[in-house]
């Protein structure tokens, strides 16, 4: 049977991965030409992209380290 810590760890890893993907996509969109259709000249869209850009910048390295450490831990637990 799976314990609560394993379930919470899996949920945490999933949320962190989704946030990293969304933030990475925001970084890509932010670097596009300002006249592109993706920017849509919308203040709310640009504000959301900027927020995800900063989140992506601040969690990229720690998030990657956490995901790697969790992966190594799961490998060690299996053997």
Curated annotation (Swiss-Prot):
The keyword DNA damage does not apply. Induction: Expressed in the intermediate phase of the viral replicative cycle. Residues 30-47 are virion surface. GO terms for cellular component: membrane; viral envelope; virion membrane. It comes from the Viruses. It is a multi-pass membrane protein. It is found in: Virion membrane. It holds the Pfam family Pox_I5. Keywords: Late protein, Membrane, Transmembrane, Transmembrane helix, Viral envelope protein, Virion. The chain crosses the membrane at residues 9-29, 48-68. Belongs to the orthopoxvirus OPG081 family. This is Protein OPG081. It comes from Vaccinia virus (strain Western Reserve) (VACV). The lineage of its organism: Viruses, Varidnaviria, Bamfordvirae, Nucleocytoviricota, Pokkesviricetes.
């Amino acid at each position: 049977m799976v314990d609560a810590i394993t379930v919470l760890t899996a949920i945490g890893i999933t949320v962190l991965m989704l946030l990293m993907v969304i933030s990475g996509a925001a970084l890509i969109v932010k670097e596009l030409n300002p006249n592109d259709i993706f920017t849509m000249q919308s203040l709310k869209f640009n504000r959301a992209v900027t927020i995800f850009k900063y989140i992506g910048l601040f969690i990229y390295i720690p998030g990657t380290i956490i995901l790697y450490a969790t992966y190594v831990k799961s490998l060690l637990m299996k053997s």
